[in-house]
């Protein structure tokens, strides 16, 4: 597959792909800004760490990198209270205490999805509440097993998506150059040779694909440091029926026998994606932002986080209470609890499916009698599937995968 700059989308592709995302993120931004949260969020107090909305000296290092998350950072959104209320299908509740973490000898490098709400095409590096909310929702629970590093980058903003995908594809180059500078700072000054876990979603996955292609895939010394890469909602591709090749030449997909040094990639849908889906089908949608234009001979990768070896498995679904990001996608409202996290066991199962040129993680409700827990829906329509919930639907599984990958890496 080509490793060139992102292809320019046609006007029709851009019109279909981005306006819904813009509207949704602007709604979420309004919720964050006005403090409009669910009853659960209002009852949870302030136990989860929150970042300020301005850049401070403690966040900016000598190289100019602004860290959304890093070890020792005051008000670190990736290292808060992880105590959790478990709510079963019958409504029974139990509270899990914040797990005590041991010494962390691995680093996690996290790139957040589209969140910036500036009016420019590319964001500045000021930390906003939307980026903080994403970091808490997606990356914080990994801090049990690794030191989470999350740089701010000059991502394409919500309002800039349409322009970036039609008349200004160079905006993605600006974003990637920013990520590359952050990575160079991290690997030169902070990693100190420790093993690395990569985590990305949506635009973060676009950037992570390009970073791994240019810096890791063909560099054995760095490749051997990678424990596992989680690339959700990004359309990693492989040759049809294969586990290596395509997006990455030397890095395989994870499997039952390959638990480290590999990639976990998927996009979640409740059923088969439509022919014009933005995810799960090669050569279209988000694939175009990484220059992956091939439509034949390849398939979008699907690795089930709950069953790396394949098959159907229950999902370990975790939702942050205080961030409003998942709230617009769930009904009825989440139950009021006193912990910053909710865990819904045995609510969904997942299976990787492949049919008619599409590959996807099919997420299906267990459907227990009397289950009144909030359910996810396709808030942006069938072409997006469960994209906005990709990480949280599988979060407990992904954290366990990282833990198992670290064990395999050691051994």
Ranges and model annotations:
Residues 1-16:
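N-terminal secretory signal peptides that target proteins for export/translocation
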Residues 32-35:
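C-terminal motif of bacterial Sec signal peptides marking the signal peptidase cleavage site
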Residues 37-39:
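Bacterial signal peptide processing site
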Residues 43-57:
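Extracellular mucin-like PTS domains
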Residues 69, 207-216:
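Short glycine-enriched nucleophile-adjacent loop
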Residues 71-74, 100-104, 110-195, 358-411:
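Active-site catalytic motif of lipid deacylating hydrolases and related acyltransferases
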Residues 178-193, 213-376, 381, 389, ...:
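Surface cap/lid and interfacial helix-loop subdomains adjacent to catalytic sites
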Residues 200-208:
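Gly/Ala-rich beta-loop-alpha elbow adjacent to hydrolase catalytic centers
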